[in-house]
Curated annotation (Swiss-Prot):
GO cellular component labels: nucleus
Pfam families found in the cross-reference section: Dimer_Tnp_hAT, hAT-like_RNase-H
Binding-site list for Zn(2+): C89, C92, H113, H127
Name of this chain's protein: Zinc finger BED domain-containing protein RICESLEEPER 2
ZnF BED-type span: 66-134
The species this protein was found in: Oryza sativa subsp. japonica
Keywords: DNA-binding, Metal-binding, Nucleus, Transcription, Transcription regulation, Zinc, Zinc-finger
A GO molecular-function annotation: zinc ion binding
Taxonomic lineage: Eukaryota, Viridiplantae, Streptophyta, Embryophyta, Tracheophyta
Length: 722
């Protein structure tokens, strides 16, 4: 009910008559700029906890009624051309249609602008809304009195979301997991004070309880991952990493890489298990077997990838192959089972190069330290470089000893300034670290070969999620370059090349088969690149090595043919309903005659189909012309589109392309892999093994989830406002 009195009027709101003048309005918002969703009017419907209720009606009156919806506290009416009017938001000044002639648009769209956070001003100031009833003051400002409760409707966005202790604890656990915070952060006074300032009702738990929260997050995410694995269409390949601690214990990390039904490649941490002797043969085999049992994937293991940390790699390989072949159905009799990490071999070869000239590198480091010791020395060195007309724009800087790429860049820059170093030594009695001419030749040779490794590493890092086919291109070129470099006429160059080739050649012999099979699954190259590259590497003996690859591809394909072909919904939906069904030998079965008098002709076609040999999917794939090479070629999408054409071969391609040729995951530096023993810090070493595993695994899993939690409900709920 309203009574018009000059510019003042009163409005029935719930059970209370609220004055509409400025003083009353200021009291209603209690110092905040906004009151959200207080837009009830006569006959307006409001959703309350999912239900729709109507505001009580007022008796009819003969007098012209003023606009009573509380929407008009936030909007003004502005006339526009054509006799129409528009509602203008007082906060953001955005206008909305209101009336045109005798037609009135209503206020529902205006309510949505206010209540659903569409107004940018409301959205930015939503955090100002109090969660708890405010305490007001009397008119004189003396003392405090509790204002009478008023029934009103408020927007239930983040600011008014109901507090949930359990949910908040779970988010805190996820924060600790994702950011590697120590569990005892919950005991730190500054943290508890900060949390209390945000939400006084939140009870900060102790360390033991937080361990339980972390483990609960781990268990929940593990269940989700296990469910995903249960529908995984292909096999899984593992990467194995060894960790040590300051104690006598060690850990084994196991990550799985696979391609899902949408032909997207994924890598997920599976286990981070404590073992008493991680470098022992049996301990590693048992850890892998335990992990496979834990994840119900004993029959889905395809390959494992190990680092190159040690001379015991061959022992590991043989032991793992023997141990797991008795428990799992290994493809191709285990010939592809153990793969060596490409990133680790690159780094191992690079470290050999650096070690071969460590004396020269020491002098260059000391020289750079001398120059960088004071601005005057830097200026003097710059003047010398200018006088010598050295065109280089490279900056001298020290390397990071654990990242060989920085050492390479340091040597490359120093090589440009070699004359400046010599001149500085003759002009400054305090400097006597300049490398000799023979030293610079060693640096030149080292940079020449480090560039091969550097470029190869960058080619791999350029791919966000590199599939196995990419690695053959890098490996065969590097094998050829190093093999040719061993015959360099300069003994300095040939000496370094021989050491590099000796190490890389072993990797090539161990892994060229799996590398070659992977590139055969690339429709741009197939067997052709294998034939070409082997002719460069092996010369007249190339045919023998090409045959090994060809035989292995055909034998592996036969093993997939022997397996049942799953009839997935994708096959049914994508298949051409007009095609005749295929017979068991791969020929197209002929549909029976429909009374057209050609029964004998049908029999003739059937005899031809059974008597003539048909091509297998593999032979058809290899015989087809190569797919054009384009820069942005997506091999996984190609196989996805050709799954119906090659149903069996595509299953084989899925497993092969998912082999992790490198243990370095996307986003991590390839240049520091394998440069030292991975050590678990003292803090994590002090935790219980199951908590360590929960922290490591859950961190990996959580990074693939949406960054923000699901927004609270945006319904209107009735609350008692202060």
């Amino acid at each position: 009910m309203t009574e018009e009195t000059g510019n003042d009027f009163q409005m029935v709101q719930g059970y209370e008559i609220v004055p509409s003048n400025e003083e009353a309005h200021a009291e209603e918002v209690q110092g905040d700029e906004l009151v959200l969703a207080e837009d009830l009017a006569q006959g307006d419907e409001v959703q309350v906890n999912g239900l729709v209720s109507a505001e009580m009606s007022t008796p009819p009156t003969s007098r012209r009624r003023r606009k009573k919806s509380l929407v008009w506290e936030h909007f003004t009416i502005e006339a526009v051309s054509g006799g129409a009017t528009r509602a203008c938001c007082k906060l953001c000044k955005q206008t909305f249609a209101y009336s045109s002639g005798s037609k009135i648009a209503g206020t529902s769209h205006l309510k949505r602008h206010i209540t659903l956070g569409s107004c940018p001003i409301i959205k930015n100031q939503e955090h100002k809304l109090a969660l708890t009833p405010a305490v007001g003051t009397d008119n004189d400002g003396e003392g405090t009195v509790e204002r009478p409760s008023k029934r009103r409707y408020r927007y239930t966005g983040y600011a008014n979301a109901a507090f949930d202790q359990d949910r908040s604890c779970s988010y805190l656990a996820k924060m600790i997991i994702l950011h590697d915070y120590p569990l005892h952060i919950v005991q730190q006074p500054a943290f508890t004070t900060f949390i209390d300032s945000l939400q006084p009702r939140f009870r900060v738990v102790d360390v033991e309880t937080m361990e339980g929260e972390v483990y609960a997050v781990y268990q929940k995410e593990k269940e989700n991952l296990m469910q995903a694995f249960s529908t995984m269409p292909g096999r899984i390949s593992l990467t194995i990493g060894l960790w040590t601690t300051s104690q006598t214990l060690g850990y084994v990390s196991l990550a799985g890489q696979f391609i899902d039904s949408e032909w997207k490649i994924h890598r997920r941490m599976l286990n981070f298990m404590m073992v008493s002797s991680p470098h022992s043969e049996n301990a590693l085999s048992e850890a892998i077997s335990t992990s496979l049992s834990d994840w119900n994937m004993k029959d889905k293991l395809f390959t494992i990838t190990l680092d190159n940390d040690c001379s015991s790699h061959d022992i590991y390989s043989a032991n793992l192959r023997d141990y797991l072949s008795n428990k799992n159905n290994l493809m191709l009799k285990g010939q592809l089972f153990v793969v060596r990490c490409y990133a680790h071999i690159l780094n191992a070869v690079a470290q050999d190069v650096i070690a071969s000239i460590h004396g020269v590198i020491y002098n260059i480091r000391e020289s750079i330290k001398f120059i960088k010791a004071s601005p005057s020395r830097e200026e003097k060195f710059a003047e010398i470089a200018l006088q010598l007309e050295i065109p280089s724009t490279k900056t001298l800087c020290l390397d990071v000893t654990t990242q060989w790429n920085t050492t390479y860049l340091m040597l490359l820059a120093a090589l440009d300034y070699k004359q400046a170093f010599s001149t500085l030594e003759t002009s400054d009695d305090n400097y006597n670290e300049a490398p000799s001419a023979e030293d610079w030749k060693k640096v030149e040779a080292a940079c020449n070969y480090l560039k091969l490794l550097y470029d190869s590493a960058h080619s791999i890092m350029a791919a966000a999620n590199p599939t196995s086919n990419l690695f053959f291109h890098e490996a065969w070129k590097l094998q050829l370059e190093l093999s040719n470099a061993t015959g360099h006429e300069d003994p300095v160059f040939s000496s370094i090349a021989k050491d590099m080739h000796e190490r890389f050649d072993k990797y090539w012999k161990d892994c060229n088969l799996v590398l070659a099979i992977a590139v055969v699954m690339d429709p741009r190259f197939k067997m052709k690149l294998v034939e070409f590259s082997y002719s460069k590497i092996y010369g007249v003996e190339a045919a023998k090595y090409v045959k090994v690859v060809d035989d292995a591809v055909h034998e592996l394909y036969k093993e997939y043919v022997a397996q049942p072909l799953p009839l997935t919904p994708a096959y049914v939906e994508q298949g051409d309903g007009n095609n005749a069904p295929a017979s068991e030998n791969g020929t197209q079965a002929t549909a029976p005659s429909t009374g057209d008098g050609l029964v004998d002709f049908d029999m003739y076609l059937s005899e031809i189909a059974t008597s003539q040999p048909t091509k297998s999917e593999l032979e058809q794939y290899l015989d087809e012309s190569l797919t054009p090479r384009i820069q942005e070629f997506d091999i996984l999408n190609w196989w996805k589109l050709n799954t119906l054409k090659f149903p069996t071969l595509s299953r084989m391609a899925r497993d092969i392309l998912a082999i992790p040729m490198s243990m370095v995951s996307s986003g991590n530096s390839i240049f520091s892999a394998g440069t030292g023993t991975r050590m678990l810090d003292d803090y994590r070493s002090s935790l219980r093994p199951e908590i360590v595993e929960a922290l490591v695994c859950a961190k990996d899993w959580l990074q693939y989830l949406p960054a923000t939690p699901e927004a609270p409900s945006t319904t209107l709920v009735k609350v008692d406002a202060p």
